[in-house]
């Protein structure tokens, strides 16, 4: 009765494992990119939602500022900065936006003339957050 593997069996096994890992590793990278982008999108949506709720609760205008160079988003109201999120550093993504910011009125309605889009990218993974003039979110 034989209790060991031959050199040929070990070589074939290593070749099969090498081929499988060569196929799986690029997919794992794309999968991780998607996870980072999705996390950033969720955080951006929560910031816009929080800004809207703060405007309603305080009965005053609240502003969301998007700094694409710093890859950060700021929520301010009443002359004070209420929330900061360094999206780019936290999630290792790039941001681009159609406008530099948006304001919510005391009723929670968006203040401004047009919709806002925030595009979140990391390598080949891309997602977009849309904020309507009414203040509604979708992606």
Residue ranges and their predicted role:
Residues 1-5, 138-139:
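N-terminal leader/signal peptides at the extreme start of proteins
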